[in-house]
A protein has these predicted regions:
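Structured-RNA-binding interfaces characteristic of tRNA pseudouridine synthases
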Residues: 1-253
């Protein structure tokens, strides 16, 4: 999502399009710096815009130019001190897994295809150990810091981690659906934390780890103790919270 040298990104494309519309240079801030391949349904972005900017017009213009790959779902003025990233107090993600022998082309771009049958109860039993305040070093890719600088804390407060089945075409009963969804929310997340958690929980579902082994994985504070990093395809930044309140286009519903 975030801009980088020599690569096309969502933020870079959005910023250049907004600058083309408004004829000014812009500096934008996003609530989440998601990896390539991750979706951002509830991404929040702020920036300093000219006083004469009409949010509704900007939204229509951007959507006409960038849809369907990129779309603004809501646009409005906020207080000067509001910052999409630093004002956020919680973030929620979803991760979808298509758990069936046969692939589903309809969800191929938004779900990880796992062939082996997964034990959903075992995955949820393991997930309960993640809730609360923990050092999540085992699930995080540590950022590089200058020599002599202190390491950044990997302590986070996890509010919710649970799996459930989602109704999808071909399965009239959600209880037998092959589409599994993880709902996960925390004060904030470190780099690759959600995908590392997903990979570890899927290992539990495959029977490669016991549910209670999650306690040892957390206490190890070692990336090697966790499972593989799940593919980015199934991950969605679902919504961002500010002072306990959800702030996105869906909050008005």
């Amino acid at each position: 999502f975030a801009e980088s040298e020599g690569g096309e990104t969502v933020m870079g494309t959005l910023r250049s399009t907004l600058e083309q519309i408004l004829q000014v240079e812009l500096d934008l801030t996003a609530a989440g710096r998601t990896d390539a391949g991750v979706h951002g349904w509830g991404q929040v972005i702020t920036g300093r815009f000219p006083d004469h900017t009409d949010p509704a017009r900007v939204q229509r213009s951007v959507n006409a130019m960038l849809a369907p790959a990129i779309a603004i779902r809501s646009a409005e003025w906020v207080a000067d001190e509001f910052d999409a990233r630093f004002s956020a107090t919680s973030r929620a993600y979803r991760y979808d897994v298509w758990n069936a022998a046969v692939p589903n082309p309809l969800v191929a771009r938004t779900a990880w295809h796992v062939v082996e049958p997964l034990d959903l109860d075992a995955m949820n039993a393991a997930a309960t150990h993640l809730v609360g305040e923990h050092d999540f070093s085992s699930f995080c890719r540590r950022p590089q810091v200058p020599q002599g600088a202190p390491e950044k804390s990997m302590v986070r407060i996890m509010h919710r981690v649970d799996w459930h089945r989602v109704a999808v075409d071909g399965f009239s009963d959600p209880g037998v659906s092959a589409l599994l969804r993880l709902e996960i929310a925390a004060s904030s997340f470190c780099h690759q934390q959600v995908r590392s958690i997903v990979g570890t929980l899927v290992d539990v579902g495959r029977g490669r780890r016991a549910p209670d082994s999650m306690l040892d994985t957390i206490s190890a504070r070692d990336r090697a103790a966790a499972g593989p990093v799940a593919p980015p395809t199934g991950l969605v930044l679902w919504h961002v919270g500010y002072d306990g309140e959800r702030w996105d286009a869906d909050r008005r519903r």
